């Protein structure tokens, strides 16, 4: 796969409650010891790491995944040329990668993560 899925995310109104739910449901070890209280789920043997937390706008929430790419701006331009739209321009995550988000033509929101960052 030339652009692997590298992260999943579950975001909702009550990040702490979601972290407790998924921790108990799947026995995940979730570390939310960071300024954003964003619960990091480390990858295990054959799995993919991710995060669980509260949304900035405290809206209904979302579930998404992040795809690794070399150039965020170039991929956002490609998204728009294919009928999608940029939802969040590139931004640096403290202690993590540079990320961006887009919506496909049907409105599904997908994340991009810069390769080699974070």
List the predicted regions and their residue ranges.
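N-terminal beta-strand motif that seeds the catalytic metal site of vicinal oxygen chelate
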Residues: 1-19, 46-47, 62-65, 114-118
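Vicinal oxygen chelate
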Residues: 5-13, 56-80, 82-118
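Catalytic core of tubulin tyrosine ligase-like
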Residues: 22
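Conserved short beta-strand elements that form part of the metal-binding/catalytic scaffold
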Residues: 27-61, 109-114
């Amino acid at each position: 796969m030339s652009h692997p899925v590298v992260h999943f995310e579950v975001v909702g109104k009550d990040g702490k409650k979601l972290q407790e739910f998924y921790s108990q449901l799947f026995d995940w070890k979730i570390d939310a010891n960071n300024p954003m209280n964003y619960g990091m789920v480390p990858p295990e043997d054959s799995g993919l790491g991710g995060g669980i937390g509260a949304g900035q706008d405290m809206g209904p929430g979302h579930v998404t995944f992040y795809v690794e790419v070399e150039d965020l701006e170039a991929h956002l331009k490609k998204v728009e040329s294919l009928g999608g739209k940029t939802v969040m321009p590139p931004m640096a995550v403290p202690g993590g990668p540079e990320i961006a988000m887009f919506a496909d033509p049907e409105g599904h929101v997908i994340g991009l993560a810069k390769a080699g960052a974070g």
